[in-house]
């Protein structure tokens, strides 16, 4: 039987399955293999921001990554709010179930030690804005009972995004009596790549119409938060395949155009590559001599993943890392990925008292 020595063991081509151990995934920073300390720096830097926006195309594991980031941060002692921005505010919440939140609505609920959950709501943001702007709460309640006003807020260009932004801003403003932030870190699961851009672009149309006054001030404050790399970071999620990486690289340019700070990129479901360059070359010679084997597809997938990682490294100027492909789903998958992220923090001390500037 043909065999090649790889990473200290014999690998038989016919037995390559593409499955991997979660402990074997590579953390890469700017295209090179990184040590655990590098991973610690990347995650610690993310967790010191006030808002982390997780974006990506559908089906790449964005929601699972959002949950895993929040769970890992909470277990590292960082109070974290996991926020869901859903286009269907009344529908079921997959994210709430992944972290054990008992309800999914505009009210913040506890989901575990150091972990809270909320579903951002445009109507809730509108209500908060009116309460802040009008001289009495009853005036805001009366205004929201107006069907005409509600229809305008629901249909007006950029007004939905303004409501979502204002609720997020209100949550980030909250402080304890001693001045500490109630939510020093908020991880936001965006429903699609376009929503990250919409949060930054559509409110500009409001500013062009109302540059001053309470509306203009609120929108400007929200944009200042989203575009400040010290307080906000975008994490792009993709898969190690040609098309998803191409879409991600296109989004990198769009984020730059609207001023949203990209902080990291994640290649999800990375297959394990057990081969060194030398053993891979030896295997290719064997395949050329003896023809295809049952592991041919898995080898081709490894090559696609390698090329995808190289393309991503060449196309982004921020740290990126791989998350392993696991035979798990739901809460079990989130738990294992959170453990994987936590392993990158070994040897790095978190300082919960240090926070980004407001």
Where do the PLM segments sit?
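Phosphate/Mg2+-binding loops and adjacent switch elements
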Residues: 138-242, 247-250
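Extreme N-terminal basic, low-complexity initiation segments
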Residues: 2-13
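Conserved beta-strand segments of the P-loop GTPase G domain that flank and frequently precede/overlap
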Residues: 54-55, 83-85, 189, 235-239, ...
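Conserved nucleotide-binding/hydrolysis micro-motifs of P-loop NTPases
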Residues: 87-90, 122-126, 192-195, 240-244, ...
């Amino acid at each position: 039987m043909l065999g090649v020595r790889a990473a200290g063991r014999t690998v038989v081509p016919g037995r390559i399955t593409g499955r991997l151990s979660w402990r074997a995934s590579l953390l890469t920073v700017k295209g090179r293999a990184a040590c655990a300390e590098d991973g610690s720096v990347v995650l610690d830097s993310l967790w010191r921001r006030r808002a982390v926006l997780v974006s990506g195309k559908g089906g790449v594991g964005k929601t699972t990554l959002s949950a895993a980031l929040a769970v890992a941060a909470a277990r590292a002692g960082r109070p974290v709010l996991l926020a869901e921005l859903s286009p269907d505010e009344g529908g079921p919440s997959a994210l709430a179930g992944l972290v054990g939140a008992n309800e999914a609505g505009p009210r913040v609920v506890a989901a575990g030690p150091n972990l809270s959950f909320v579903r951002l709501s445009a109507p809730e943001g509108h209500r908060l804005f009116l309460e802040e702007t009008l001289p009495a709460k009853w005036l805001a309640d009366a205004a929201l009972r107006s069907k005409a006003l509600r229809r305008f807020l629901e249909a007006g260009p950029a007004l939905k995004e303004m409501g979502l932004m204002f609720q997020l801003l209100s949550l980030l403003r909250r402080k304890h009596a001693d001045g500490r932030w109630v939510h020093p870190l908020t991880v936001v699961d965006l429903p699609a790549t376009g929503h990250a851009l919409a949060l930054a672009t559509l409110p500009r149309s409001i500013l062009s119409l109302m540059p001053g006054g309470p509306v203009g001030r609120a929108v400007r404050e929200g944009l200042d938060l989203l575009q400040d790399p010290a307080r906000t970071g975008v994490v792009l999620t993709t898969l190690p395949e040609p098309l998803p990486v191409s879409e991600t690289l296109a989004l990198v340019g769009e984020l730059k155009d609207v001023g949203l700070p990209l902080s990291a990129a994640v290649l999800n479901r990375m297959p394990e590559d057990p081969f060194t360059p030398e053993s891979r070359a030896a295997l290719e010679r064997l395949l050329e001599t003896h023809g295809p084997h049952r592991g041919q597809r898995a080898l081709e997938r490894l090559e696609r993943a390698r090329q995808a990682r190289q393309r991503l490294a060449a196309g982004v100027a921020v740290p990126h890392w791989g998350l392993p492909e696991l035979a798990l789903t739901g809460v079990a998958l989130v738990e294992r990925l959170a453990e994987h992220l936590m392993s990158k923090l070994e040897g790095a001390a978190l300082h919960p008292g240090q926070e980004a500037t407001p």
